[in-house]
From Swiss-Prot:
Organism: Oryza sativa subsp. japonica (Rice)
GO cellular component: endoplasmic reticulum membrane; membrane
The protein, known as: Transmembrane and coiled-coil domain-containing protein STS1
Protein topology in the membrane: Multi-pass membrane protein
Keyword Transmembrane tagged: yes
Annotated gene: STS1
MF annotations from Gene Ontology: carboxylic ester hydrolase activity
Length: 661
């Protein structure tokens, strides 16, 4: 395999991915950082709770490797997440089962340090050549980070960086609380100080692992038969979560991993375009050899050749400038290309921007969400349309964000709340049943401006009404009468949201997102659409790899009587429930559920693996989410692996204090 990693290091790389996969699955049901003691007990709980029955013993994987309980583990062969990676890394097949058992054992975290030390070992042979190649790759990552450039912190990092690579000492920007995040990440036997400050080797490791995760790998006939019904091509959300955790172990900022994703996507597209142009009728084996040789981390990529090809699918001015700035350094390190060659290619990149349709990454075929016709109509849903938002389209992004409003006064409100949020996802908004959403939102607004509502607000009755609801007190008759005309519109909107959720699930199952991990974020009825989508995905097996993260804001979803655990299992990474105890409008409109079953948008929910974030300080009414969504998302720090435990009020006080100084 064309990589700078030795066979032993490739073995360690596969082991680290396996360990990260297992730890990430544990964190689905044991909220990371929620317990600072009895880590081993937590890990064993995570091991058993992921099985469908929730029960089971504490026997190790080595003595129970064939049991049905182990089939639920992401590291099990039935999920197809590890063995294709092992094959790509050319790890001896005799070692595969041992790696899987090590990852599944309750002592897995104690192996992490040993495997990391192997990764950073130098064997003395050709170490100079390897260092040059790894440095070239790290430089390529730096260039890509600059082109992503929507993060002010990245700019500060570049200004303060050393000559070799952007510093990555703050990969976990801030830990949740004063305790070391090592304990919370399952590496309590290892401190980050034990990891060598070899940024170049870290980039080579992450590049190799990502390449292995997304490559279309040849398999045996038996595996091919099973893959056709069970495995999906593309980038599995569970792989991305595991790489996010591994990046945290390595203290690598996530934007660097995003840069590597773009590089791999563009390299793959360049290889595909070259293959298409040559019109070769190559055998699967020769295609595989070509992919390994040139499509990923081959010599061309590591010496800069393929890195230049990447510019074809990017917004060229920024990245061309980056190549121009780095040309002298890279030219010295890679005489084959030369400084003038880099400068010339950087200039050329500015004139051919967008010539490579990298939006077709892994099956999106250019059209993707926006180019597809509406999914099969369900019930009476008349409108269900994806619209691109932001500047990250046709940029080789390997992750997608779908943003869903559920409270709107005009069509712009389906887009406006999400415009200011800066992220490197390829983002889309879902505009659905706008007629009904606007109707119910307007009805609520009209009621708020009525004489009765104004009088009640003047008397401070609204918050006491909500308190009364939670205590199951009787409602004032005047208030009930005033909300009658809202109820019918709300009932219709609830019905449409449930059906839209099923349609969203169908879109994801069809792979219209390009077989890339999806982040789902929605507020109000949009949050309900997402929840119902997850429930629909949970009805059939093997759908755990589609959705990476979920954020529900002000969700009109009952706490009891809904399959929260099943929905949680469909999300590989973080699942956040954002609520406001002062959202009395949600309580009024969904009062029947609130009285008997609780309501996620108003209170914390006790579901293993779900983060609860109280935003009462920002949201004093349901419509507040329209203006507060961006600030809430920034507070959640979704690109960190661990949950955010700092209350919003405390975070604001800290910010105010910093400004005051």
């Amino acid at each position: 395999m064309a990589t700078t990693l030795t066979p032993t290091q490739r073995y360690a790389a596969g082991a680290l991915l396996a360990l990260a996969l297992r730890q990430a699955q544990i964190h689905q049901s044991v909220l990371l950082g929620a317990h600072h003691h009895h880590d081993d007990d937590d890990e064993e709980q995570g091991r058993t709770s992921t099985s469908s029955g929730g029960g089971g013993g504490s026997s190790s994987s080595s003595s129970n490797s064939g049991a049905g309980a182990d089939a639920d583990l992401w590291t099990h062969d039935s999920h197809g997440l590890l063995r294709p990676v092992f094959r790509f890394l050319e790890i001896d097949p005799k070692a595969w089962s041992g790696l899987e058992e090590t990852a599944a054992s309750s002592e897995a975290k104690h192996h992490i340090g040993a495997f990391l030390r192997i990764i950073f070992e130098e064997d003395g042979e050709s170490s100079s050549d390897r260092s040059v190649q790894e440095l070239a790759l790290a430089k390529g990552v730096d260039v890509m980070v600059m082109s992503l450039g929507n993060d002010s912190e990245v700019g500060n990092t570049i200004k303060g960086g050393d000559q070799d690579a952007l510093p990555s000492s703050s990969g976990t920007d801030k830990s949740p609380g004063e305790s070391s995040h090592d304990d919370q990440l399952g590496i309590n036997k290892l401190t980050l100080d034990d990891i060598p400050a070899n940024n170049h080797r870290k980039m080579a490791l992450l590049f190799a692992l990502l390449s292995a995760c997304v490559a279309d790998k040849p398999v045996s006939q038996e595996e091919e038969d099973r893959k056709s019904t069970r495995f999906r091509k593309g980038y599995d959300a569970r792989h991305r979560v595991a790489l996010r955790l591994l990046s945290t172990w390595l203290d690598v900022k996530w934007i660097k991993m995003e840069a590597i994703e773009v590089m791999v996507a563009c390299s793959a597209m360049a290889a595909a375009k070259e293959q298409e142009q040559s019109q070769e009728s190559a055998s699967p084996k020769s295609k595989w050899e070509k992919w390994k040789r040139g499509g990923i981390i081959g010599a061309a990529a590591l010496t800069g050749g393929a890195l230049l090809a990447i510019t074809g699918g990017l917004a060229a001015p920024a990245i061309a400038a980056g190549f121009g700035a780095l040309a002298p350094t890279l030219g010295t390190l890679v005489p084959v290309i030369g400084a003038s060659g880099f400068a010339a290619m950087a200039t050329a990149a500015g004139s051919v921007a967008g010539s490579v349709a990298v939006a077709a990454s892994f099956g999106a075929a250019g059209a993707g969400l926006t180019g597809s016709k509406m999914a099969r109509r369900i019930g009476s849903v008349k409108e269900f349309e994806f619209k691109p938002i932001g500047e990250n389209h046709n940029q080789g992004r390997l992750a997608v964000g779908i943003l869903i409003s559920g409270f709107a006064f005009d069509e712009d409100d389906f887009c406006r709340p999400w415009e200011g949020w800066q992220d490197n996802l390829e983002r889309y908004i879902l505009q659905w049943e706008s007629k009904h959403i606007i109707a119910v939102s307007t009805a609520i607004q009209d009621w708020l401006t009525s004489r009765l509502a104004m009088e009640l607000m003047k008397q401070g009755a609204m918050r006491t009404v909500l308190s009364g609801l939670l205590a199951a007190f009787a409602w004032p008759a005047t208030l009930l009468a005033a909300t009658d005309f809202i109820d019918s519109k709300w009932s219709v909107a609830i019905d449409r949201s449930d059906k839209a959720g099923k349609m969203l699930a169908e879109v994801l199952l069809k792979g219209l997102q390009g077989n890339r991990p999806v982040t789902l974020i929605g507020f109000s009825l949009g949050a309900r659409v997402i929840f119902k989508c997850l429930q629909e995905l949970a009805l059939s097996s093997d759908n755990e790899g589609l959705v990476e993260r979920v954020v529900l804001l002000g969700a009109p979803v009952s706490v009891k009587g809904e399959r929260w655990e099943a929905a949680r299992k469909m999300v590989a990474g973080r699942f956040v429930n954002v609520y406001s105890t002062d959202d009395w409008i949600l309580g009024v409109t969904f009062r029947a559920s609130l009285l008997t079953q609780g309501l996620a948008g108003i209170q914390a929910i006790d579901v293993p693996g779900v983060e609860n974030v109280d935003v009462t300080e920002l949201v004093d009414g349901h419509s507040s989410y329209l203006s507060a969504a961006q600030q809430i998302l920034e507070h959640l720090e979704l690109n960190t692996y661990y949950p955010v435990f700092v209350p919003l009020s405390a975070a604001n006080e800290e910010t105010d204090g910093t400004v005051a100084q």
